[in-house]
Amino acid sequence: MGVVRVQHETKMENQSWLKKLARRLGPGHVVNLCFIVVLLFSTLLTWREVVVLEDAYISSQRNHLENVANALDKHLQYNVDKLIFLRNGMREALVAPLDFTSLRNAVTEFEQHRDEHAWQIELNRRRTLSVNGVSDALVSEGNLLSRENESLDNEITAALEVGYLLRLAHNTSSMVEQAMYVSRAGFYVSTQPTLFTRNVPTRYYGYVTQPWFIGHSQRENRHRAVRWFTSQPEHASNTEPQVTVSVPVDSNNYWYGVLGMSIPVRTMQQFLRNAIDKNLDGEYQLYDSKLRFLTSSNPDHPTGNIFDPRELALLAQAMEHDTRGGIRMDSRYVSWERLDHFDGVLVRVHTLSEGVRGDFGSISIALTLLWALFTTMLLISWYVIRRMVSNMYVLQSSLQWQAWHDTLTRLYNRGALFEKARPLAKLCQTHQHPFSVIQVDLDHFKAINDRFGHQAGDRVLSHAAGLISSSLRAQDVAGRVGGEEFCVILPGASLTEAAEVAERIRLKLNEKEMLIAKSTTIRISASLGVSSSEETGDYDFEQLQSLADRRLYLAKQAGRNRVCASDNA
């Protein structure tokens, strides 16, 4: 147990944490660590630049979208403002109609024709629009239609007045294709004239069955606000898709009818193309409130849709939480913004190929190339320096080993042995453990050299060193101190234990024959002297070695090939 304890304590003392760290973190590991830190920091800085660049790219996409959305909103707002103006004029006309003879005549004419299947009242084609209507019988068949109101005459004159305003408001430069007032009392006024009276019922019922009319009932539109509706063409129809902005006309809590303006989708498509900067890439798409595709600025998708149902669902989910934003879909960046004066959303789609061709793409490519170049140079530098450090470390280790070891026997040389012995002796003295020394000298070695040559002598020394090393304990230290003489240090071993080790060495040396030439073998022997600190309490290694050396010569005088552990031969 004492031997095991000394072994453990010896290792704990000699292998301090600094030495352990130095052994584990050799020069190669330090170089690797430094280059890894540099690579991580360079990658982190590059990543930070990428994040800043991405934020700038997203802001740029939103700014481009906002510019187009604002331009489209202004035009739509202009039409909404006209619609509100017309409604206010209609309300004033309902409350205080103009007392013109022509208007009174129009009311009289209505009373004369109201029972006819279809009728038209026209004052002056250059100044106002005609009022087109159906009979009382047809009106009574509709659920939302009614002529049972006290202000029916005022509504007729108000319709003629608003027809005059509609003609003035409608012009070729406007986005609006048709402006109209449709009454629940069975008549309508439209900027698109009805050429034949027989077409009036069909056209009227086409109006009152549209969502933009039905959607303004007091149950459907309780706030009586402006609403937008989309009409999609049927499969077999030639009707062009359009959006309709409409507003209810009420007075004294009675719903009279609906004012509306229809804008063709092709007109909005043309406006989108005109509003976009020609130097910018990206596609703009207009959707209604239910994310139904209306139009696109891309000629390749005039009536198509580049989003599949899953992507539309993702887009709808993102739009639930904000009025503007962006989302990545595969290699595309999709930004969107809800319009203020249209019940829909404007979407901008920017593909990866378009981004690469743009300014941000050029900066991203340059940044990537710089990072790749820096990383490549860093790796090349790491490889060169790592090889240099590795070679220097190997050379240093080789020189250090040669400085501490005997190259022939591969045991410690004299200087290294003394360096090892002193701290071991001091440690044993501190813990009051024995410290023993064995001196070994090969018998008749000079005769072997003289008879078989120095090469044979070198082989004998190497053979003997191997046998000595194989006979020692793990904590023992052996070295060649000169010529054919060896020294063994045994920390924690008593004199008796050291003598047993010495006897084991002697037996191993003597019992094995050695081939030194063709058909020539020899058997070697050795004389050994043993000393220990137990005898005198002296832990001085040089004194113990001198004592062991003296006993070695006593063994030689006693006939060689023996162990001497006392001064009595």
Swiss-Prot record:
<feature type="binding site">
    <location>
        <position position="441"/>
    </location>
    <ligand>
        <name>Mg(2+)</name>
    </ligand>
</feature>
<keyword id="KW-0472">Membrane</keyword>
<keyword id="KW-0342">GTP-binding</keyword>
<keyword id="KW-0460">Magnesium</keyword>
<comment type="function">
    <text>Catalyzes the synthesis of cyclic-di-GMP (c-di-GMP) via the condensation of 2 GTP molecules. Cyclic-di-GMP is a second messenger which controls cell surface-associated traits in bacteria. Involved in the regulation of cellulose production.</text>
</comment>
<feature type="transmembrane region" description="Helical">
    <location>
        <begin position="25"/>
        <end position="45"/>
    </location>
</feature>
<comment type="pathway">
    <text>Purine metabolism; 3',5'-cyclic di-GMP biosynthesis.</text>
</comment>
<dbReference type="GO" id="GO:0030244">
    <property type="term" value="P:cellulose biosynthetic process"/>
</dbReference>
<dbReference type="GO" id="GO:0046872">
    <property type="term" value="F:metal ion binding"/>
</dbReference>
<feature type="binding site">
    <location>
        <position position="484"/>
    </location>
    <ligand>
        <name>Mg(2+)</name>
    </ligand>
</feature>
<dbReference type="GO" id="GO:0052621">
    <property type="term" value="F:diguanylate cyclase activity"/>
</dbReference>
<dbReference type="GO" id="GO:0005886">
    <property type="term" value="C:plasma membrane"/>
</dbReference>
<dbReference type="Pfam" id="PF00990">
    <property type="entry name" value="GGDEF"/>
</dbReference>
<dbReference type="InterPro" id="IPR043128">
    <property type="entry name" value="Rev_trsase/Diguanyl_cyclase"/>
</dbReference>
<dbReference type="GO" id="GO:0043709">
    <property type="term" value="P:cell adhesion involved in single-species biofilm formation"/>
</dbReference>
<dbReference type="InterPro" id="IPR029787">
    <property type="entry name" value="Nucleotide_cyclase"/>
</dbReference>
<keyword id="KW-0135">Cellulose biosynthesis</keyword>
<feature type="binding site">
    <location>
        <position position="458"/>
    </location>
    <ligand>
        <name>substrate</name>
    </ligand>
</feature>
<feature type="domain" description="GGDEF">
    <location>
        <begin position="433"/>
        <end position="568"/>
    </location>
</feature>
<feature type="binding site">
    <location>
        <position position="454"/>
    </location>
    <ligand>
        <name>substrate</name>
    </ligand>
</feature>
<dbReference type="InterPro" id="IPR033416">
    <property type="entry name" value="CHASE7"/>
</dbReference>
<dbReference type="GO" id="GO:1902201">
    <property type="term" value="P:negative regulation of bacterial-type flagellum-dependent cell motility"/>
</dbReference>
<feature type="active site" description="Proton acceptor">
    <location>
        <position position="484"/>
    </location>
</feature>
<dbReference type="InterPro" id="IPR000160">
    <property type="entry name" value="GGDEF_dom"/>
</dbReference>
<dbReference type="InterPro" id="IPR050469">
    <property type="entry name" value="Diguanylate_Cyclase"/>
</dbReference>
<keyword id="KW-1133">Transmembrane helix</keyword>
<comment type="subunit">
    <text>Homodimer.</text>
</comment>
<keyword id="KW-0812">Transmembrane</keyword>
<keyword id="KW-0479">Metal-binding</keyword>
<feature type="binding site">
    <location>
        <position position="449"/>
    </location>
    <ligand>
        <name>substrate</name>
    </ligand>
</feature>
<comment type="pathway">
    <text>Glycan metabolism; bacterial cellulose biosynthesis.</text>
</comment>
<keyword id="KW-0997">Cell inner membrane</keyword>
<dbReference type="GO" id="GO:0005525">
    <property type="term" value="F:GTP binding"/>
</dbReference>
<feature type="transmembrane region" description="Helical">
    <location>
        <begin position="365"/>
        <end position="385"/>
    </location>
</feature>
<keyword id="KW-0808">Transferase</keyword>
<protein>
    <recommendedName>
        <fullName>Probable diguanylate cyclase DgcQ</fullName>
        <ecNumber>2.7.7.65</ecNumber>
    </recommendedName>
</protein>
<keyword id="KW-1003">Cell membrane</keyword>
<keyword id="KW-0547">Nucleotide-binding</keyword>
<feature type="site" description="Transition state stabilizer">
    <location>
        <position position="446"/>
    </location>
</feature>
<dbReference type="Pfam" id="PF17151">
    <property type="entry name" value="CHASE7"/>
</dbReference>
